[in-house]
Amino acid sequence: MSPMNAFDPQAEDSTTTIGRNLRSRPLARKKLSEMVEEELEQMIRRREFGEGEQLPSERELMAFFNVGRPSVREALAALKRKGLVQINNGERARVSRPSADTIIGELSGMAKDFLSHPGGIAHFEQLRLFFESSLVRYAAEHATDEQIDLLAKALEINSQSLDNNAAFIRSDVDFHRVLAEIPGNPIFMAIHVALLDWLIAARPTVADQALHEHNNVSYQQHIAIVDAIRRHDPDEADRALQSHLNSVSATWHAFGQTTNKKK
């Protein structure tokens, strides 16, 4: 019997089939806090409470929804995680606009869990490669003189940090952050910041001396990327970026293998 015939009132076994389908799809019960959260979220999205406006007090919300204080507090906490409200001690929740950082931050826990699984780091490194490849191509085609100057300044700080691994990591992140800023898209920035945070947190601990050569190689590759962007050559910028990130990936993979052997 086809899916359409399964719900044909003329079909001989339609009642049995419908009953079987309903039994196989039990309705999920929602917590009171989830229902309060959904209703408040809809009210905010319908502009019944404008940005910056305070929501009713907990006591008023308890009376309005006929629920207890824990349900109201759980609902408000969920709205805060979504970036829809701000909660300060002693004050009523205030409606806010979710930022790109808030949206990406919601994925942080899942991303870190994914990174801990076999192949997780490789998948995120591939994501970074695809993402930054587009960024450098855009930069080579559209970067202004002022934006190229910012890249050059980030590169200079990079060069001054070669012998200080903590400082080099910061300058390295800042260099790539400038690339992510060039399109002027806040979502790109939020994705880029989170992506680097996740990957750096997943890297193994390595002795400072082992990182010095890696720092210098990365710096030289950064120079190649900036030179290609300055010449407005997207193909060369892309090649330089891919060479750089593939090198970084291989280096940290080797560091990880060495660390595992020592355990």
Swiss-Prot record:
Keyword Cytoplasm tagged: no
Alphabetized UniProt keyword annotations: DNA-binding, Repressor, Transcription, Transcription regulation
InterPro entries associated with the record: GntR_C, TF_FadR/GntR_C, Tscrpt_reg_HTH_GntR, Tscrpt_reg_NanR, WH-like_DNA-bd_sf, WH_DNA-bd_sf
Residue ranges annotated for the HTH gntR-type domain, each copy included: 30-98
Keyword DNA-binding on entry: yes
Ranges of the DNA-binding region feature: 58-77
Molecular functions per Gene Ontology: DNA binding; DNA-binding transcription factor activity
Superkingdom per UniProt: Bacteria
Segments of this protein annotated with the region Disordered: 1-23
SMART domains, sorted: FCD, HTH_GNTR
Gene Ontology biological-process entries: negative regulation of DNA-templated transcription
Similarity comment text for this entry: Belongs to the NanR family.
HAMAP family: HTH_NanR (MF_01236)
Function: Transcriptional repressor that controls expression of the genes required for the catabolism of sialic acids.
The protein, known as: HTH-type transcriptional repressor NanR
Gene expressing this chain: nanR
